[in-house]
Curated annotation (Swiss-Prot):
Carrier of the growing fatty acid chain in fatty acid biosynthesis. One of its GO terms (molecular function) is acyl carrier activity. This is Acyl carrier protein. Pathway: Lipid metabolism; fatty acid biosynthesis. GO terms for biological process: lipid A biosynthetic process. InterPro entries: ACP, ACP-like_sf, PP-bd_ACP, Ppantetheine_attach_site. It is found in: Cytoplasm.
Length: 76
């Protein structure tokens, strides 16, 4: 499974959205309806899935699906 597929699955599981809604340009808050707790849970799920630690400053910059993909790929 690719990074994109893993991140899409995490987003679908955490936010209860469909695969069609998880587009690279989708904003977690504006397009996918996430609140601050959802964002924290998404970051924690990504940390667990990819075995990395995302510091708070970086986490605040992950606003869209493509931001998460780029961040994870950069950390691997």
């Amino acid at each position: 499974m690719s990074v994109e597929e893993k991140i899409s699955k995490i987003i679908m599981d955490q936010l209860g959205v469909s695969a069609e809604e998880v587009k690279p340009e989708a904003s977690f808050v504006e397009d996918l309806g996430a609140d601050s707790l959802d964002l924290t849970e998404l970051i924690m799920a990504m940390e667990e899935e990819f075995g990395i630690e995302i510091d708070d400053d970086d986490a605040q910059k992950i606003l869209k699906v493509q931001d998460a993909i780029a961040y994870i790929k950069n950390k691997q």
